[in-house]
Swiss-Prot record:
This is Methionine--tRNA ligase. ATP binds at K335. It catalyses: tRNA(Met) + L-methionine + ATP = L-methionyl-tRNA(Met) + AMP + diphosphate. Pfam families: Anticodon_3, tRNA-synt_1g. Monomer. Its cofactor is Zn(2+). The gene is metG.
Amino acid sequence: MSERIFIGVAWPYANSQLHLGHVAGAYLPADIFARYHRTRGDEVLMVSGSDMHGTPITIRAEQEGITAAEVAERYHRLFMASWPKLGISWDCYTSTATANHARTAQQMFLSLYEKGYIYKDTVCQPFCPHCNRFLPDRYVEGTCPHCKYEGARGDQCDNCGKPLNAAELLNFRCKNCGNPPEFRETEHFFLKLSAFEEELTHWVETKTYWRTNVLNFTLRYLKEGLKDRAITRDLDWGVPLPLPGYEGKRLYVWFEAVIGYLSASIEWAASKGQPDEWQKYWGGDTKSYYFIGKDNIPFHTIIWPAMLMGRGGLDLPYDVPSNEYLTIEAQKFSKSRNKAIWVDDVLSRYSVDTLRYLLSANMPESSDMDFSWREFVRRNNDELVATYGNLAQRVLTMVCRNFDNKVPEYGELDERSLNLIEKTSAMLFETDKALHGCNFREAIKLAMSLAQEANRYLDEKAPWKEIKVDKAAAARSLYVAMAALSGLRVAFYPFLPESSSRLSTYLGFGSEIEKDGWVLKMPVAGQEMIPPEPLFKKLEDSVVEEETARMGL
């Protein structure tokens, strides 16, 4: 039975290039999930966009002496160029700088305001006398009162993940000049989160299928009690407040950016010439998934659901499969200290599927995982090249050489051959279950295990020997190995779309795997084939030293 799936993916700040931490945290798992569901025949809408209004953008603009718009547009263009290289298959990738997004965000604000879920109040906000301005939360840094991390920001501690207010920080200082700010009164608008505490708690308690880290974090946060949060800031960059008399205020980015999931859906529908089409992905029997990093958990399991509850008429998240962090050579990714692997740079030297494979096999689903160049080389050479790639190359090459570039006639199959076909079908069934539950590491491990089993079958049958004495027996063995490869092209497709599409073409099916469905499609005897090229390339051991030296490790 087909499903309708909405996939919202975290919006990257348009203030820096994409690095592998971003990819492993949200974008790759979302793409795997989308490709899997499309192959199953499900309706899928996957959206995201560049967050153009965050304070990281204004901070970078001030550092470079240019406007925030110039910074945001520069990195938005870079993101747009990077996604195809990564194989990320968006249905709509946009930005928060569109008129459609501003309109949608303002409509959400007004809806909540008119229903009494947004109110205004006079509060004390950090003001830097030296810079002569109010400081947005990310312009304030200090020590986290909860975990004592010294690099906490005025909106959140990246170490323990807890949202913060600037006044809670210990030893706080202005990020721009380093001087301690003072607090002055200013009027702001607040989201009445406290009004949703009971409803949110009951809702979250039903999410027993959520990842343990996501569920526990959310329940722990709810038990501490929800505090109303300011949703406006004294800025000149961002979505204007849709009320007269407040021209100097903008919607706070954490409130505004999550509305992008809705505005992107509306933009997608308009681009199709069906302006109401977005509604089917936001109501009824649609399941909505939000792929994010763990620092975004409370915004997607508490704040965004509260906003949706307050507005009414829109689906709440079905699942929020947040990932933990990806470290690099046992160190946390850090853009400021150049401890990062930049997407465009690494893809200039290595194939996208090699990169996607390692990130999938080491995906930080329930705990932090490490990216190691030694592991990168080992998995590429031992698993992609020697196991999966070698299986495809020797089977397809033998078929093309000995059977006139056609899928061989296979006759009656013996028990061992039938057993491999059964195992291939079982693998597709098990990977389907794993992917449906967002267990990506388990799914790719199952696929590689089947490749290992197919290699054992091939070694037992030894068609290179059979061909010399019994061509019909060799034909049967090679045909069954091709059937296993047919299953593997499907199972690996969400993870490794480029090589899977090539393998599908070599098998005689054509490159569009999604049209075939999540089933074992048997090769057609007599089908014309083309001689294969290797799916993957071996990497030299010197890569480890070269790449660690490039990063100064």
